[in-house]
């Protein structure tokens, strides 16, 4: 079959019309040096600070330094795949992370990729990891409580939704234990249908051992807490760049809940290692070192992260993001650079002491220097009523106890005060992974402050508390329910509680 010239011309015209010759302009640079997770790149004249670039091997990098004739990038991943002379292209985009409820129950890395072997995460929503903190008009004051389930904290150092409360102390003093107990304690609220009672949790492990994190994830799974928790990992074996961006990625995940009228709690464990990772990056990028070799902007590193925790106004949905940053001190030195920085940014601190921990007082909270600057506005009235005098009584007890070491010749009133103080300390002790509902905490502290324990031997106080709570749960659940619904101790509730306690103490003391 012969084609006529006119037909050939028509076919050619059709094919030419269908050709898609849209060319995409790419800006490409070249790696001039690479080492220790840092790449120096030449030829990216229009690249921006904080922009993501892609290396020839597919590994991503983050631009942090803009110099006269080159740019410095941190490599996010295996930097052994990046070689001198490799091409680098701009993505014209900043770092983003996957957000949404699909992440709940999952363990992800600093870039939001799942690492728990449970398959892909189905979510279409992404957020920038660096977001501007809400302004003054968008916020409202802290007014709702975050119940940690820990008596010493909920009674004396209350935490509110939208607050930043620092947990600070030496290694092995129970900092992570407080954070994990707080996550586990949210399970009761998640069993309710009311969305405003629920608090979604995010745990960020920065520079931790993989074995430690595996234990934490196992504990959360066993307690049924992973259903409402996201775990973000940047362990000690990972690049400093991933340890640096992990808290910002996790914060964006938390902001999804905050900005959609929900409530979230984020735990940064810990920001000391985060600052060390940033110091490492800064020194490798040849930035001038300052105090303790940290760069000049190390305060801004943490302030821009923690300022994103907020209680939003009703116009903005009324959601909240509460932050519990953790800082590890060396030999109890809270006046070091990073601890003082974070103390000044946060709304209070829970200070844990090694001496108390070794004495068996756990949680090892030093009530004297621990403080919550805004949490008292969120504390429920019933707790305020019973715990109002506890801090003063404990302070007086510590003073008299230290005084009693110099001589045994004490008057009966001082001896009684010391004995009462010892029982208060005993009632505030709590075992790990056993958070206590707020109504039961109120009853326990009421027992301690109203001197019902005076006739109970010190070594039997915990046993007495356990038996008393078991009895009230079994036979007088109505008292607990009344405290829970009323959220204050009315005269009627107090009469019922007094009658129950008098009968129980009498019966308990009779039993041999």
UniProtKB/Swiss-Prot annotation:
Site residues (Required for activity), renumbered to this chain: 370
Keyword Cytoplasm attached: no
What this protein catalyses is: ATP + H2O + 4 H(+)(in) = ADP + phosphate + 5 H(+)(out)
Q: Which GO terms describe its molecular function?
A: ADP binding; ATP binding; proton-transporting ATP synthase activity, rotational mechanism
What EC number(s) would the UniProt record show?
A: 7.1.2.2
Chain sites annotated for binding ATP: 169-176
Q: Name the domain of life this protein comes from.
A: Bacteria
What parts of the sequence cross the membrane?
Answer: none
Q: Identify the keywords attached in UniProt to this record, alphabetized.
A: ATP synthesis, ATP-binding, Cell inner membrane, Cell membrane, CF(1), Hydrogen ion transport, Ion transport, Membrane, Nucleotide-binding, Translocase, Transport
HAMAP family hit by this protein: ATP_synth_alpha_bact
**Sorted alphabetically, which Pfam families does this protein's record hold?**
ATP-synt_ab, ATP-synt_ab_C, ATP-synt_ab_N
Q: Which gene encodes it?
A: atpA
Which named protein is this?
ATP synthase subunit alpha
**InterPro entries according to UniProt:** ATP_synth_asu-like_sf, ATP_synth_asu_C, ATP_synth_asu_C_sf, ATP_synth_F1_a_nt-bd_dom, ATP_synth_F1_asu, ATPase_a/bsu_AS, ATPase_F1/V1/A1_a/bsu_N, ATPase_F1/V1/A1_a/bsu_N_sf
Q: Where does this polypeptide localize?
A: Cell inner membrane
Species the sequence originates in: Rickettsia typhi (strain ATCC VR-144 / Wilmington)
